[in-house]
Curated annotation (Swiss-Prot):
Bilayer topology term: Single-pass membrane protein
GO cellular component assignments: cytosol; mitochondrial intermembrane space; mitochondrial membrane; Nebenkern
Region: Serine protease, residue numbers: 138-301
Organism: Drosophila virilis
CDD domains: cpPDZ_HtrA-like (cd06785)
InterPro entries: PDZ, PDZ_6, PDZ_sf, Peptidase_S1_PA, Peptidase_S1C
UniProt cross-references to PANTHER family, sorted A to Z: SERINE PROTEASE FAMILY S1C HTRA-RELATED (PTHR22939), SERINE PROTEASE HTRA2, MITOCHONDRIAL (PTHR22939:SF129)
Official protein name in the record: Serine protease HTRA2, mitochondrial
Any GO BP: ectopic germ cell programmed cell death
Length: 421
């Protein structure tokens, strides 16, 4: 198209252009003495724009060489400008507006992520071959609730692990050893203390005002991947502990479809105001996870603070004399129904048991062959219907536990030797 335009312009200029103008240095080409003359013959104009008599002129070819690129450049600029106006693209201003309007999750994370911490449980008996440091036996999450280093997490993240030490890594990468201050095994809550000040603190909201369908964000370190964010909605605000087979707890859990997996335990479940409204606690299957309501957590924190003012730590819960190294969940009829509907290879005849949610690396359960997802149905020939039955089996004092499990559709037997605390 551009070449055709040039050809048309060249023909037009040949036909209608005026005679060549030239400037005279001494005299005109045909005797003109006024300094400016005309030359009707283009043949007297050579390729160097210089004639025999020393006159320099501008032919129609010079005009083309100047005018065509200039015209095409102006035309291209005009077309680009018109296209930018007509093309339905999102401008930077419009994009930023849409992002501000719809990326509310990012705003939540920006406001509270600095207070979330990564918790590692280090095995002081085993050391990494290359670094010489204690290996990580398990991990979890937590969040800062006081500027002077007080951290909230789940009890199962930090207790019942002999010969271990607790280490906390902040969002900025700094790492500190931690001491366990308060523990409530019944509610599965604990606090840690690290020796550092001026930390970012997580705001605590109200779980009593939550509604089903409300957006929430789960923060933590699933599978040791720190600073991980997942989002979902509140599926239920009143999931009773009895429905989950937790007979020793009187808690109405928050149920959410936000992804909570290994390592998320102890991390915050926050609302769109960036306030913690729960503590991530457990997962049954994809889309079904539970958190401890923050109103219940506040009661634990008030009691713990009162104990600290009196000079003693707040430690309650059923004693576990021996350590196996698993996190478990009772399979209630409702949970069994959900599992069977989501898992194709689960036998329809299964009516009871305890789901192994997490196995701590290096623990007796890990050494004995238990795996996450196993369902414990019998221990030492006794039926296991809830998690309390497992604690009773540990308290029997037998050296070994003969455990019958269901792994997929296959029934298996494993032998575990629990450790003394």
């Amino acid at each position: 198209m551009a070449l055709r335009s040039i050809n048309k312009l060249e023909v037009f200029l040949k036909r209608y252009s005026a005679p060549t103008l030239y400037y005279c240095s001494n005299k005109s080409a045909h005797g003109a003495t006024n300094g400016i003359g005309t030359d009707d013959s283009n043949n007297n104009y050579n390729n160097n724009n210089k004639n025999k008599n020393g006159y320099t002129g501008f032919s129609w070819r010079s005009v083309i060489r100047f005018f065509v690129p200039f015209s095409l450049g102006a035309l291209a600029s005009t077309m680009v400008a018109q296209r930018e106006e007509l093309t339905p693209t999102i401008s930077a201003r419009a994009l930023s507006g849409r992002r501000r309007e719809f990326n509310f999750i990012a705003d939540v994370v920006a406001g509270c992520a600095d207070s979330v911490v990564y918790i590692e449980i280090k095995d002081t008996r085993h050391f990494d071959y290359f670094s010489g440091q204690p290996i990580t036996a398990s991990n979890g999450s937590g969040f800062v609730i006081e500027q002077n280093g007080l951290i909230l997490t789940n009890a199962h993240v930090v207790i019942n692990k002999p010969n271990t030490m607790v280490q906390v890594r902040l969002s900025d990468g700094r790492t500190f050893p931690a001491t366990i201050e308060d523990v409530d095994q019944t509610s599965d809550l604990a606090t840690l203390r690290i020796q550092v000040n001026n930390l970012s603190v997580m705001k605590l909201g109200k779980s009593s005002t939550l509604r089903s369908g409300e957006w929430v964000v789960a923060l933590g370190s699933p599978l040791a991947l720190s600073n991980t964010v997942t989002a979902g909605v509140i599926s239920s605000t009143q999931r009773a502990s009895q429905e989950l087979g937790l007979r020793n707890r009187d808690i109405n859990y928050l149920q959410t479809d936000a992804a909570i997996t290994f390592g998320n335990s102890g991390g915050p479940l926050v609302n769109l105001d960036g306030e913690a409204i729960g503590v991530n606690s457990m997962k049954v299957t994809a889309g079904i996870s539970f958190a401890i309501p923050i109103d219940y957590v506040k009661v634990f924190l008030e009691r713990a603070a009162a104990r600290r003012r009196k000079g003693s730590a707040y430690k309650t819960g059923y004693p576990v004399k021996r350590y196996m190294g698993i996190t478990m969940l009772t399979l209630t009829p409702d949970i069994l129904f959900e599992l069977k509907s989501r898992t194709q290879n689960m036998p329809n005849t299964l009516s009871h048991g305890v789901l192994v949610w997490k196995v701590i690396v290096g623990s007796p359960a890990h050494s004995g062959g238990l795996q996450p997802g196993d369902i414990v149905t019998h221990i030492n020939k006794k039926e296991i219907k809830n998690s309390s039955d497992v604690y009773d089996a540990l308290a029997d004092g037998k050296k070994e536990l003969d455990i019958v499990i269901l792994r997929g559709v296959k029934q298996m037997r494993v032998t575990i030797t629990p450790e003394d605390p």
